[in-house]
């Protein structure tokens, strides 16, 4: 088939960039069932490209096939279903197109047997015109198929020139039928089948391409058989290898094809005649031990084959004794595929990336890895981009092969490591992330692979790009966290969750936070690392202590973000015993304001959920802890310019403000009054911060308190929070509100209430504290100035 052509060049797409973008966009519309109606017909080449994009994304299903095949809008003549879960009824849609090429893959169709019924499938998928004109048929795949299909093919597909059935458990009998009936074949791929004798194909004298990768030929005169195929241009006799030792993996005795070709080459040179393969352009000998020769003798062996075939343009010697040898033949323009240099390694990967050769792909990826590890700075920008593209293709095509994923993910780590990632475009970074996440999903329990993946993604630059799929990244990280308890993997996945959760769209975050299992697990981790930290702190293991603290801090950040405006997640945190653990952390880390701030942020989110009725937070013991967190040295600035003491106090105040609004549950009225007075006293002491300390998805956390509370202290906290984000609105955009904080304020319904408060009026508080009044006036002034300068917002002044 076309995709197996052995003569390759460094794969750069011939499709213009604009056409490629259009192709991908149309495929996306089809995938989302959002393709608009249009009258014109899309030509075959473009239709085929769109179909291929959907195939590579594994999005071929009944809906997408119906869109592409049921109407005459798309003119498809090549259909490839490999790697997609397609059922027999879906194949009926393919019959609406007139095809010249068809690749089946593995479908779930086993009526009364455990084999794919090839004749039924082809009858369903191919209409009369397709059967008359079909030239390429690929039946390669892993499932078993019926053995009598060559008879059907010979009878129904008269113009067939190219046939592949690699990886099927097909034996000599089927090949005999092909040799007897399909005499017009020019291309044949029988790789990794159960064929042990190829004598029967000597009748296929029109063959130009013969692919026999990983074939155990045990009998027959192979050299004589191949000698009858005088039109051969491409011959693949490569074998799967153990890439650690460069040895053929099969221990079975098999005929040495390379030795036969060598002997004929020597005979031809000595007699001054041509070999039977005078038209040979490419030969693949990768993985062969070359009859156990050493490097010098192996080189002489290969040179004889090259000398005897003057038209030879390409020879593949990957994973052979000549893998790292420089082979140059005077006066010959010969492409040697091995790993002798950086350029040849990239070429080798481009040659095998789209072929089903996982052992060779893995071998090439290992070589890429070592080049990146030891000589990254030697890569030109073009080489780097080509290398990245090929690694991603290899990982996508070899998703079911663990060695490919481990080697590929290691390459991606070196390509994205630290500042190196800035040499890549956003689209290339996205490609890295998608391939990494695919690997992480496929192999949850493979710790080394998981380390590679999360080391790659745990990159500050990468995680702050707006264009990446934060939802999928977070989801895969959370799932990995559940299933892989390696400490370093756990630490990285939790860190990533803590960073990307606030970047998700509200609809995506809502889907994710309905999975309460994540919260239960994070609460458990929170408890485990609290105990680990206190234990290591006691025995003086500073390094383990730092690791425990690092993980605990990111766990708290993740929970803080997951519980934000999400009642279901807050309830799960409560049910998992998170409140008790949170207060234990507050006590254990009374010297560590950053940790306390994160805990208080979580408790603040819980306190905002009115339906939870958090009376348990009003215990004297808990209230005392919260009040103690209010005080601090508010003018102190840390090395990063942050007012940590203000942050801690603000979130402690938020919890108390919510508890003061809910009058039930307080064990001591004096403690309640103390909390209210403390809020007024300390919030007034907050300095004007140079930058935003917090951001809000909405003003819902403030609305209920401002509307219902009879506590001056609670109102004071709300107004300070609103004032703070309005004050820094230019540089601190509302994360999920496109219009901005001024419009959020107006839409929240707070405006008229705050307007009343600025005049000293409140429905719920008889004596509104003057400090609250002053803060309300400052908010109204900010909104009024904005209204006058840049916005149609109007405030209604009440007197």
UniProtKB/Swiss-Prot annotation:
GO molecular function, one term: cyclin binding
Short name of one Pfam family: ZER1-like_2nd
Keywords: Developmental protein, Meiosis, Ubl conjugation pathway
Outcome, altering residue 18 to S: Abolishes interaction with elc-1
GO CC field: Cul2-RING ubiquitin ligase complex
GO biological process, one term: anterior/posterior axis specification, embryo
Chain intervals for the UniProt region annotation (Interaction with elc-1): 1-131
InterPro entries given in the database record: ARM-like, ARM-type_fold, LRR_dom_sf, LRR_Zer-1, ZER1-like_C, Zyg-11_UBL_adapter
Family: Belongs to the zyg-11 family.
Oligomer status and interactors: Interacts with elc-1. Part of an E3 ubiquitin ligase complex including zyg-11, cul-2 and elc-1.
Function: Acts as a target recruitment subunit in the E3 ubiquitin ligase complex zyg-11-cul-2-elc-1. Required for metaphase to anaphase transition and M phase exit at meiosis II. Regulates polarity establishment.
Protein name: Early embryogenesis protein zyg-11
Species: Caenorhabditis elegans
């Amino acid at each position: 088939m076309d995709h197996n052509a052995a003569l390759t060049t460094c794969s750069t797409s011939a499709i213009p960039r604009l056409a490629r973008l259009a192709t991908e966009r149309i495929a996306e519309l089809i995938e989302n069932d959002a393709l608009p109606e249009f009258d014109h017909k899309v030509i075959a080449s473009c239709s085929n490209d769109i179909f291929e994009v959907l195939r590579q994304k594994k999005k071929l299903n009944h809906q997408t096939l119906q869109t592409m095949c049921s109407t005459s809008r798309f003119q498809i003549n090549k259909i490839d279903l490999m790697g997609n879960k397609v059922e027999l009824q879906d194949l009926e849609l393919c019959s609406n197109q007139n095809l010249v090429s068809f690749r089946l893959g593995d479908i779930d169709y086993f009526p009364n047997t455990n084999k794919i019924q090839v004749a039924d499938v082809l009858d369903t998928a191919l209409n009369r015109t397709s059967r008359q004109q079909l030239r390429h048929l690929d039946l390669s795949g892993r499932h078993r198929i019926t053995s009598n299909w060559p008879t059907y093919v010979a009878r129904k597909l008269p113009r067939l020139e190219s046939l592949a059935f690699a990886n099927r458990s097909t034996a000599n009998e089927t090949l005999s039928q092909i040799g007897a009936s399909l005499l017009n074949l020019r291309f044949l791929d029988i790789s990794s089948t159960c064929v042990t004798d190829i004598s029967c194909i000597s009748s296929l004298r029109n063959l130009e391409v013969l692919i026999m990768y990983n074939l155990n030929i045990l009998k027959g005169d192979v050299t004589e058989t191949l000698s009858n195929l005088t039109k051969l241009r491409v011959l693949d006799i490569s074998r799967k290898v153990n890439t650690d030792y460069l040895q053929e993996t099969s221990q079975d005795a098999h005929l040495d094809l390379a030795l036969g070709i060598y002997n004929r080459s020597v005979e031809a040179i000595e007699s001054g005649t041509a070999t039977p393969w005078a038209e040979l352009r490419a030969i693949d000998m990768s993985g062969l031990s070359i009859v156990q020769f050493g490097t010098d003798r192996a080189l002489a062996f290969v040179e004889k084959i090259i000398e005897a075939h003057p038209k030879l343009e390409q020879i593949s010697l990957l994973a052979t004794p000549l893998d790292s040898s420089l082979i140059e033949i005077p006066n010959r323009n010969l492409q040697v595929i091995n790993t002798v240099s950086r350029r040849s390694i990239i070429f080798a990967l481009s040659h095998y990336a789209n072929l089903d050769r996982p052992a060779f792909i893995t071998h090439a990826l290992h070589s890429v890895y070592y080049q990146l590890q030891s000589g990254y700075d030697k890569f030109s920008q073009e080489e780097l981009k080509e290398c990245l593209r090929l690694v991603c293709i290899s990982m996508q095509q070899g998703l079911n092969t663990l060695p490919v994923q481990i080697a590929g993910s290691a390459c991606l780590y070196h390509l994205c490591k630290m500042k190196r990632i800035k040499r890549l475009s956003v689209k290339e970074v996205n490609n890295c992330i998608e391939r990494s996440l695919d690997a992480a999903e496929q192999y949850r329990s493979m710790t080394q692979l998981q380390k590679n993946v999360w080391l790659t993604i745990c990159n500050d630059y990468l995680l702050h790009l707006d264009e990446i799929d934060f939802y999928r990244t977070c989801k895969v990280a959370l799932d990995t966290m559940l299933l892989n308890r390696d400490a370093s993997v756990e630490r990285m996945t939790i860190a990533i969750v803590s960073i990307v959760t606030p970047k998700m769209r509200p609809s995506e975050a809502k889907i994710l936070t309905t999975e309460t299992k994540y919260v239960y697990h994070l609460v458990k981790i929170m408890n485990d690392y609290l105990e680990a930290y206190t234990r290591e702190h006691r025995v003086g293991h500073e390094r383990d202590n730092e690791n425990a603290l690092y993980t605990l801090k990111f766990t708290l950040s993740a929970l803080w973000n997951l519980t934000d405006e999400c009642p279901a997640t807050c309830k799960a945190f409560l049910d998992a015993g998170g409140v008790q653990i949170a207060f234990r952390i507050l006590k254990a880390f009374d010297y560590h304001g950053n940790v306390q701030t994160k805990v208080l942020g979580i408790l603040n989110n819980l306190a905002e959920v009115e339906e939870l009725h958090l009376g348990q937070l009003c215990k004297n013991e808990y209230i005392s802890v919260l009040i103690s967190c209010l005080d601090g040295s508010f003018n102190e600035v840390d090395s990063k310019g942050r007012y940590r003491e203000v942050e801690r106090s603000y979130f402690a105040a938020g919890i108390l403000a919510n508890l003061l609004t809910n009058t039930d549950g307080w064990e001591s009225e004096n403690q309640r009054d103390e909390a209210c007075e403390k809020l007024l006293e300390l919030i007034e002491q907050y300095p004007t911060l140079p930058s935003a300390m917090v951001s809000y998805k909405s003003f819902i956390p403030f609305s209920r308190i401002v509307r219902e509370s009879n506590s001056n202290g609670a109102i004071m906290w709300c107004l300070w929070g609103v004032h703070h984000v309005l004050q820094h609105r230019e540089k601190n955009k509302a994360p999920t509100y496109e219009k901005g904080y001024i419009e959020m304020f107006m839409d929240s319904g707070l405006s008229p209430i705050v307007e009343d408060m600025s005049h000293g009026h409140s429905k719920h508080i008889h004596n509104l504290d003057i400090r609250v009044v002053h803060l309300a006036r400052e908010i109204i002034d900010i909104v009024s100035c904005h209204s006058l300068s840049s916005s149609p917002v109007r405030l209604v002044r009440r007197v």
